[in-house]
A protein has these predicted regions:
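Sec-dependent bacterial lipoprotein signal peptides
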Residues: 1-16
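Short, low-complexity N-terminal intrinsically disordered segments enriched in polar/charged residues
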Residues: 16-41, 45, 161-171
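A solvent-exposed, acidic/Ser-Thr-rich amphipathic alpha-helical stretch
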Residues: 44-99, 105
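Short, solvent-exposed coil/turn segments at beta-strand boundaries
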Residues: 49-50, 102-104, 132-139
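A mature extracytoplasmic/lumenal domain signature
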Residues: 51, 61, 111-113, 130, ...
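Extracellular/periplasmic catalytic domains that process cell-envelope and extracellular macromolecules
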Residues: 100-103, 123-125
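Exposed beta-sheet edge and beta->alpha loop/turn motif
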Residues: 109-138
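Low-complexity, intrinsically disordered terminal/linker segments enriched in charged
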Residues: 141-172
């Protein structure tokens, strides 16, 4: 009889066990937070260590155009070069981790990037969404979406002005 009761309790306990499918606190979220800090601080080796070998990164591109972590870091270094300061507004960051019906683990991030253009002092404020797929504690896929058109237009205008100044100096 004790065995039957024990088996009943065991089966009930096992039957009620479920994995967490949604959370706002996890080691994966902590890894994303540290990766964002690494980006802001220019700690590129630490930043890249969060990614699995062969990770595919899709920042403002479709899945037909993946980048490696090395390509992504090179691109990010270039994109922040014109700025005297840049950071995320950490007080407004939002994170969540979900486990899909297929058992995939994803971390989503919503934040606000702020940067000050060195040449003009103009501040840019850009909403950012990032989502990361994790396998064995490493990022295997990353998607990122933000609109940097205003920055690009400003940089294009500054380059045009610099060309005009250079042309005027040459003709004098």
């Amino acid at each position: 009889m004790k065995t039957v009761i024990f088996l009943g309790v065991l089966l009930t306990t096992l039957g009620c066990t479920s994995t967490t499918r949604y959370t706002q606190q996890s080691p994966e979220i902590d890894l994303v937070k540290s990766g964002i800090s690494n980006y802001v601080n220019g700690e590129w080796e630490d930043y890249s260590s969060n990614y699995a070998d062969g990770a595919s990164i899709f920042f403002n591109v479709t899945e037909e155009s993946p980048a490696t972590i090395q390509e992504t870091i090179a691109s990010q270094k270039l994109s922040v070069e014109p700025f005297s300061t840049y950071a995320f507004d950490r007080e407004k960051d939002e994170y969540e981790m979900v486990v899909t019906d297929k058992g995939e683990t994803w971390v989503n991030f919503w934040g606000t990037w702020k940067g000050t253009l060195a040449a003009t002092g103009e501040e840019f404020v850009i909403p950012v969404h990032l989502t990361y797929q994790f396998v064995d504690g490493k990022i295997v896929k990353a998607f990122g979406y933000w609109n940097n058109a205003e920055i690009q237009m400003t940089l294009t205008e500054l380059a045009k002005e610099a060309e005009e100044i250079a042309a005027n100096q040459t003709s004098d």
